[in-house]
Structure formats: structure tokens, C-alpha cells
């Protein structure tokens, strides 16, 4: 995988930094694992904007990724690695011994031809998925479930991982990249190793148009708006907003805690590190 800084042949190329992976499949994705992906433009069923800065972008197919890894005891071979426009990580097309194909997240170091497996009898190596009760303490894992059988929810982005730091009774304690320490049932599954494509963080799009290709619309500052649109809006000439930074709905936006799910507080051993 190479990080390439483009030559400044134009204003739009001057700041572009690309991540090029020659191992990725250059053809079309596997048609049997594609689904339609309709664009919402950030609107809900009433037509109102519920998510700002969303709209446009290149048409995409959704790749159906296996986050449950519940095909136990059947070895699988990695056929190829592919780009996925719906996530920062790359995905791997795997062929099971019984003929079924599935997409999974590509782990760091995974290559075409590798053998992987799921289940309690799987070997302790990158790409294999096991319940947390069968994973040694101190191991680095990704794609971790929060509820048994629900599918992976933690550590799915490019370059992310979680460390298993303890196991006590029915729960395993995980250290997340944010510094948070969290308990998860030991029957939840996780995949060994880190998520691949860690160089994704070095990428620079270089121009506004590249954001638009990805369906991201411009972000307008509150101080540039009118009073009807934002608490920072209005004033004669340029102003600083006149109050502590808030969202368009008046909620403080710099370090203000908004977590309100008290039901799951008991699973958080330590909150994340302050930046």
C-alpha cells in the first residue's frame, strides 16, 4: 500500500494525497452480495432535513457484509480484497468450503489465498472470529459484538482495534481506542487482529468537489447566518457570535456531555480520555 502525494499540476491536485493499494480487485463486485442503496438527501419520511450536510454524491451499491461471522467449523478461503464505498475499511470476499461466498472486513495483513475460520475451535490468528471467552487476555481484536448474535458494532473502521484486558465471569473488559474501558458479554464474538487500511487517515481529498462526490454538502458557519437560522447569527458586520459556541438548536458544542443512556452506564468501567 502506497501513499502518493500528487504533483501540483492544478489547484485541485495541489493538496491531494492518495492511498493506493495494488492488491484490491479492479473488476466489479460480487453481484450476489449487492443491495440497492437509495439516497435520502438527509431527509426523513416527512421530507424534512434530519441530517445536515448530506446530499448528492456518486451512485453506490451497498455491499452486504457478514458482521455476525456465525458460519462455524467451515474453513473459508479469501478470494480477493475489494474497495467498499460505504466504509473506510476494505472488504474481503471469502469462499467457504460448502460453496457459499460472503464479504467480511479485511483484517490487517489479510491477502488473497489466506484461510480463515469462525467458531470456538478456530485458530488464534488474524481474521478468525471467536467468542470473547475463547480469546486470550491481551489480544487485539476488531469487529466486536455488544450483544451475542447481534453482529459486530465496535471497531469496524479502517485501522481500528480493541484490546481484551480482562475476563471476569460473564463479562470481558475491553479497552477501546478512545481510552474507554467497557464490559461486553463473553459470548459476544470478535475477530482477531486490527482492521486493515490504516493508511486511510493519511488521505487528503484536496478539493471541495471530492467531498461532493462522496455525498457531503458544505458546512456553513453559524456566525455567517441570520438570527432566524442560528443562535450565532446576525449582527452588524463581522461578529464573534457573542456567546459560547452552540449548535443551531442552542446546545453547547465544545466538550458538553450529551450521553443520556443510563441503562448501559453499568457496562462502562471508565469513560473515554479527554482530548
Swiss-Prot record:
GO terms under cellular component: large ribosomal subunit
Keyword vocabulary terms for this entry: Ribonucleoprotein, Ribosomal protein, RNA-binding, rRNA-binding
Region (Disordered): 223-275
Pfam families listed in its UniProt record: Ribosomal_L2, Ribosomal_L2_C
UniProt record, GO biological process: cytoplasmic translation
GO MF assignments: rRNA binding; structural constituent of ribosome; transferase activity
InterPro entries: NA-bd_OB-fold (IPR012340), Rib_uL2_dom2 (IPR014722), Ribosomal_uL2 (IPR002171), Ribosomal_uL2_bac/org-type (IPR005880), Ribosomal_uL2_C (IPR022669), Ribosomal_uL2_CS (IPR022671), Ribosomal_uL2_dom3 (IPR014726), Ribosomal_uL2_RNA-bd_dom (IPR022666)
Free-text function comment from the UniProt entry: One of the primary rRNA binding proteins. Required for association of the 30S and 50S subunits to form the 70S ribosome, for tRNA binding and peptide bond formation. It has been suggested to have peptidyltransferase activity; this is somewhat controversial. Makes several contacts with the 16S rRNA in the 70S ribosome.
Family: Belongs to the universal ribosomal protein uL2 family.
HAMAP family associated with the record: Ribosomal_uL2_B
Stored PANTHER family: LARGE RIBOSOMAL SUBUNIT PROTEIN UL2M, RIBOSOMAL PROTEIN L2
Subunit structure: Part of the 50S ribosomal subunit. Forms a bridge to the 30S subunit in the 70S ribosome.
Record protein name field: Large ribosomal subunit protein uL2
Amino acid at each position: 500500500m502506497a501513499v502518493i502525494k500528487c504533483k501540483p499540476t492544478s489547484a485541485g491536485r495541489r493538496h491531494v494525497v492518495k492511498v493506493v493499494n495494488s492488491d484490491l480487485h479492479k473488476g466489479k463486485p460480487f453481484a450476489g452480495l449487492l443491495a440497492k442503496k437509495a439516497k435520502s438527501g438527509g431527509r426523513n419520511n416527512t421530507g424534512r432535513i434530519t441530517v445536515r450536510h448530506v446530499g448528492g454524491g456518486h451512485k453506490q451499491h451497498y455491499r452486504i457484509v457478514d458482521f455476525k461471522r456465525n458460519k462455524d467449523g467451515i474453513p473459508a478461503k479469501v478470494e480477493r480484497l475489494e474497495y467498499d464505498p460505504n466504509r473506510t475499511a476494505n472488504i474481503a470476499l471469502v469462499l467457504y468450503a460448502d460453496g457459499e461466498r460472503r464479504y467480511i472486513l479485511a483484517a490487517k495483513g489479510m491477502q488473497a489465498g489466506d484461510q480463515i475460520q469462525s467458531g470456538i475451535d478456530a485458530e488464534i490468528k488474524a481474521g478468525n472470529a471467536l467468542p470473547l471467552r475463547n480469546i486470550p487476555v491481551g489480544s487485539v481484536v476488531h469487529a466486536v459484538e455488544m450483544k451475542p448474535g447481534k453482529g459486530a458494532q465496535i471497531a469496524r473502521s479502517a485501522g481500528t482495534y480493541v484490546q481484551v484486558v480482562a475476563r471476569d465471569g460473564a463479562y470481558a473488559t475491553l479497552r477501546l481506542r478512545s481510552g474507554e474501558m467497557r464490559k461486553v458479554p463473553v459470548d459476544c464474538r470478535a475477530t482477531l487482529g486490527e482492521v486493515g487500511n490504516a493508511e486511510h487517515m493519511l488521505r487528503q481529498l484536496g478539493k471541495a468537489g471530492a467531498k461532493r462526490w462522496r455525498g457531503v454538502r458544505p458546512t456553513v458557519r453559524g456566525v455567517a447566518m441570520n438570527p432566524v437560522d442560528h443562535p450565532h447569527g446576525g449582527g452588524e458586520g463581522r461578529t464573534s457570535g457573542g456567546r459560547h459556541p452552540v449548535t443551531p438548536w442552542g446546545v453547547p458544542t465544545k466538550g458538553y456531555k450529551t450521553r443520556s443512556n443510563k441503562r448501559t452506564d453499568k457496562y462502562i468501567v471508565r469513560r473515554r480520555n479527554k482530548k
